[in-house]
Amino acid sequence: ARLYRNEIAISAVDTPVPRAIASQASDELLNISGILASFVLYPGAEGEVMISARSIGSCNVQMVLEPLGGGGNAATAGAQIRGSTVRDVLRELVASIDKFYET
């Protein structure tokens, strides 16, 4: 995982993992001191890019993921993006995080 904006952990992997494992990883990243939000990106079984997101702070993960087609609530959200790569979705995610913090 990498640290972004001093309070967000982002983990992106190129290997498919079960959804439950990605959700657990999102939860566990919040246990790191100072981390208020986490995003785990991974390829899904059908080639889509999956995102599992969690927050315990001011970062509303639902609002961050809505522009990417995701949903959920302020503390727990997810997205499935078809026709893209983990790397490209990571760039879109970072842009969406930046936009969230600018508003």
Map each language-model feature to its residues.
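Hydrophobic helix-and-loop "lid/oligomerization" segment in the mid-to-C-terminal part
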Residues: 1-68, 72-103
